[in-house]
Curated annotation (Swiss-Prot):
SUPFAM superfamilies: Glyceraldehyde-3-phosphate dehydrogenase-like, C-terminal domain (SSF55347), NAD(P)-binding Rossmann-fold domains (SSF51735). Pathway: Amino-acid biosynthesis; L-lysine biosynthesis via DAP pathway; (S)-tetrahydrodipicolinate from L-aspartate: step 4/4. Signal peptide: none annotated. It comes from Dehalococcoides mccartyi (strain ATCC BAA-2100 / JCM 16839 / KCTC 5957 / BAV1). NADP(+) binds at R38. The active site is at H153, K157. It catalyses: (S)-2,3,4,5-tetrahydrodipicolinate + NAD(+) + H2O = (2S,4S)-4-hydroxy-2,3,4,5-tetrahydrodipicolinate + NADH + H(+); (S)-2,3,4,5-tetrahydrodipicolinate + NADP(+) + H2O = (2S,4S)-4-hydroxy-2,3,4,5-tetrahydrodipicolinate + NADPH + H(+). (S)-2,3,4,5-tetrahydrodipicolinate binds at H154, G163, T164. It holds the Pfam family DapB_N. Catalyzes the conversion of 4-hydroxy-tetrahydrodipicolinate (HTPA) to tetrahydrodipicolinate. This is 4-hydroxy-tetrahydrodipicolinate reductase.
Length: 263
């Protein structure tokens, strides 16, 4: 089997480095290039010490030089959108883990997949446990009409609420088919978080955290809490690998890893 050639955009970041380390451990996946705005040297040493790969801030140059099958993107929305446009123009399939896109940007990404006849998966979360958490919250939403979401992340995360929290809320509302019970009014504006059709969403940003979320349902005499905790970025890698392997056989746009898991 011919190895899948992968370029990592955001390669100097923590997620980018974790992706490269994981790719080096896979026989059928081959890291061929690294891109990052902070690139100064023409080559990046691979984390496992097995060699180096072309490294540049110029994405178009790296794509032309390496001709990858897939580009993995873990950056920020402002940097990701131009990169997605460039990769699509080069007919490179995309695995996007960046969050913070506007609805208009997501629509553009979907159109880029169609126009360029490539596969693009955009997933707010690649941790399999987090995907299952959202699925279980959907199930509970059919039976319990009061709920709140608390998401907690490290203090360097720029967007809030998190992409996972927004997907969770949207999935819960879709499963329920109507708004949740309206929470009590707040005396201090925004003290109770952001409301989405009856679901309050609370965002916590603190050093020492990585990525955590809990969905709390309440009813007379009982509560149900569904929680996922990510303690290291290693937990995202099985999902990233699945996405890379599937997207080379997929045309069009896929939103969410749950579609690949067939939940």
């Amino acid at each position: 089997m011919t190895p899948i050639k992968v370029v990592v955009h955001g390669a100097s970041g923590k997620m980018g480095q974790e992706v490269l380390k994981t790719l080096c451990q896979e026989n059928n996946l081959h890291p061929v290039g690294a891109v990052d705005i902070r690139a100064e040297n023409p080559a990046m040493a691979l984390p496992d010490g097995s060699g180096s790969i072309p490294y540049s801030a110029d994405l178009s140059s790296i794509l032309s030089q390496t001709k990858p099958d897939v580009m993995v993107d873990f950056t920020v929305a402002k940097a990701s959108m131009p990169a997605v446009r460039i990769a699509a123009a080069h007919k490179v399939n995309l695995v996007i883990g960046t969050t913070g896109f506007s609805p208009e940007e997501i629509s553009e990404i979907e159109q880029l997949a169609k126009t360029n006849d490539i596969g693009i998966i955009l997933a707010p979360n690649f941790a399999l446990g987090a995907i299952i958490m959202v699925h279980l919250a959907q199930v509970a939403s059919r039976f319990l009409s009061s709920a709140e979401v608390i998401e907690l992340h490290h203090d360097k995360k720029l967007d809030s609420p998190s992409g996972t929290a927004l997907v969770t809320v949207a999935s819960m509302l879709e499963a329920r088919g109507e708004a949740f019970n309206k929470p009590p009014k707040e005396n201090l504006t925004d003290a109770r978080g952001q409301e989405h059709d009856g679901i309050r969403v609370h965002s916590v940003r603190l050093p020492g955290l990585l990525a955590h979320q809990e969905v709390i349902f309440g009813a007379a005499g009982q509560t149900l809490t569904i929680r996922h905790d990510a303690f290291s970025r290693e937990c995202y890698m099985p999902g990233v690998l699945l996405a890379i392997k599937e997207i080379v056989h997929t045309k069009g746009f896929v939103f969410g890893l749950d579609k690949l898991l067939k939940l």
